[in-house]
């Protein structure tokens, strides 16, 4: 039976334990997700408190991290999502806010022009990030946001 949290505290506490264990054991997000059948993005988001994990996956990652049975149960609990209550001052997260501030109206206009009136789902959604070489030197981040379009329906 699925259970859910009504506060962020349980998952935030577990996230701290996950991060401590990951650091102490020198693990990577990709290594934690390996063999689970889920993407590294989904498993990372779950371990950072944003998604529940299926029981078998929760057991695998908890074992890799050295976490107890209570952690396995909490990893399966539906979290209270969205832990950013205001604009983060973390430079990496802030850049995403900045991208939306600069390009948000452009994205909205292009989505509506190409799809009509509606939204892009963050529920039926996939996220991917890849590091690629920049032909001008250095590296670039290619971030793919793949969400189902959901049209508004008159009623």
Swiss-Prot record:
A Pfam match: Cyanate_lyase
InterPro entries: Cyanase, Cyanate_lyase_C, Cyanate_lyase_C_sf, CYNS_N, Lambda_DNA-bd_dom_sf
Active site per database record: 95, 98, 121
Reactions catalysed according to its record: cyanate + hydrogencarbonate + 3 H(+) = NH4(+) + 2 CO2
Superkingdom of origin: Bacteria
GO molecular function: cyanate hydratase activity; DNA binding
Single Gene Ontology BP annotation: cyanate metabolic process
EC number: 4.2.1.104
Keywords from the UniProt entry: Lyase
UniProt cross-references to SMART domains, sorted A to Z: Cyanate_lyase
SUPFAM superfamilies: Cyanase C-terminal domain, lambda repressor-like DNA-binding domains
TM spans (from-to): none
NCBIfam families registered for this protein in UniProt: cynS, PRK02866.1
Function: Catalyzes the reaction of cyanate with bicarbonate to produce ammonia and carbon dioxide.
Membership in a protein family: Belongs to the cyanase family.
Protein's name according to its UniProt entry: Cyanate hydratase
Gene for this chain: cynS
């Amino acid at each position: 039976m699925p259970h859910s949290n009504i506060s962020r505290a349980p998952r935030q506490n577990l996230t701290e334990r996950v991060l401590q264990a990951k650091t102490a054991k020198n693990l990577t997000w990709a290594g934690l997700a390996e063999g689970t059948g889920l993407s590294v993005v989904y498993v990372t988001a779950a371990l950072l408190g944003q998604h529940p994990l299926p029981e078998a996956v929760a057991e695998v990652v908890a074992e890799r991290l050295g976490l107890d049975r209570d952690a396995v149960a909490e990893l399966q609990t539906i979290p209270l999502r969205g832990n950013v209550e205001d604009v983060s001052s973390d430079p990496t997260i802030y850049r995403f806010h900045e991208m939306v501030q600069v390009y948000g109206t452009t994205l909205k206009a292009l989505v509506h022009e190409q799809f009509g009136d509606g939204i892009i789902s963050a529920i039926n959604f996939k996220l991917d990030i890849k590091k690629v070489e920049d032909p001008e030197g250095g590296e670039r981040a290619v971030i793919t946001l793949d969400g189902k379009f959901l049209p508004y329906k008159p009623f």
